[in-house]
Amino acid sequence: MASLTRAVTRLAIAGRQAVRTIATTTPVSGHGDDIMEKWPADKFDNHFINYLNRPEIDGWEVRKALSELHDYDVIPDPKVVEAALRACRRVNDFALAVRFLEAIKIKCGAQKNRDTVYAYIVKQVEPVLKELGIDTPEQLGYGEPEFFVPEPEYWWEKKWYKDYGYDKHPNIQI
């Protein structure tokens, strides 16, 4: 019995020495691009302008750049918007250009900000829009929903009429 115990002990000690411990590394954050948030505004803008102005860019890369730009908590500068619209036109993606303008409008936030910031951006890029033949969502009729009629007795608060500009519509009575 003693020899059996000695054999098991010897195997356990030998096995412990034979097993190599696995070196672990510290987990790295999946957000490697978060450093871009700390860039100065000019460097940030130039990164996207240079990326979107590449002549060999394809549709997937344009979508990737616009998606990445949308992920950051910024409203793009008109220079970046111009580069994005030109890239959309270069790959012949009219719908992406309109959706990009709509995303900028949504990122502007409340109606007050949309009236000032979004209007400023559209005014600045208007020559490029005309040159490329791209319409804004408002020109296409996407400024407000097609079949939306608020029903205040169900869920619509009366103060929202004024916030969203429905107090000026002739068919809606408060």
Curated annotation (Swiss-Prot):
Kindly tell me the pathway this chain contributes to. Answer: Energy metabolism; oxidative phosphorylation
InterPro entries to which the protein is assigned, alphabetical: Cyt_c_oxidase_su5A/6 (IPR003204), Cyt_c_oxidase_su5A/6_sf (IPR036545)
The topology of this chain with respect to the membrane is:
Peripheral membrane protein
Q: Does the keyword Metal-binding apply?
A: yes
Tell me one Pfam family matched here: COX5A
User: In the database record, which residues form the transit peptide?
Assistant: 1-29
Q: Where in the cell is it found?
A: Mitochondrion inner membrane
Which superkingdom, per the lineage?
A: Eukaryota
Which Gene Ontology cellular-component terms appear in the entry?
A: mitochondrial inner membrane; respiratory chain complex IV
What UniProt keywords apply to this chain's record, in alphabetical order?
A: Heme, Iron, Membrane, Metal-binding, Mitochondrion, Mitochondrion inner membrane, Transit peptide
Instruction: Give the Gene3D superfamilies listed for this entry.
Output: Cytochrome c oxidase, subunit Va/VI
Q: Name the predominant localization.
A: mitochondrion
In the record, what terms sit under GO molecular function?
metal ion binding
Decide whether keyword Heme is in the record.
Answer: yes
Q: How does it assemble?
A: Component of the cytochrome c oxidase (complex IV, CIV), a multisubunit enzyme composed of a catalytic core of 3 subunits and several supernumerary subunits. The complex exists as a monomer or a dimer and forms supercomplexes (SCs) in the inner mitochondrial membrane with ubiquinol-cytochrome c oxidoreductase (cytochrome b-c1 complex, complex III, CIII).
What PANTHER family does its record include? CYTOCHROME C OXIDASE POLYPEPTIDE, CYTOCHROME C OXIDASE SUBUNIT 5A, MITOCHONDRIAL
Job description of the protein: Component of the cytochrome c oxidase, the last enzyme in the mitochondrial electron transport chain which drives oxidative phosphorylation. The respiratory chain contains 3 multisubunit complexes succinate dehydrogenase (complex II, CII), ubiquinol-cytochrome c oxidoreductase (cytochrome b-c1 complex, complex III, CIII) and cytochrome c oxidase (complex IV, CIV), that cooperate to transfer electrons derived from NADH and succinate to molecular oxygen, creating an electrochemical gradient over the inner membrane that drives transmembrane transport and the ATP synthase.
- What protein name is recorded for this chain? Cytochrome c oxidase subunit 5A, mitochondrial
Species of provenance? Caenorhabditis elegans
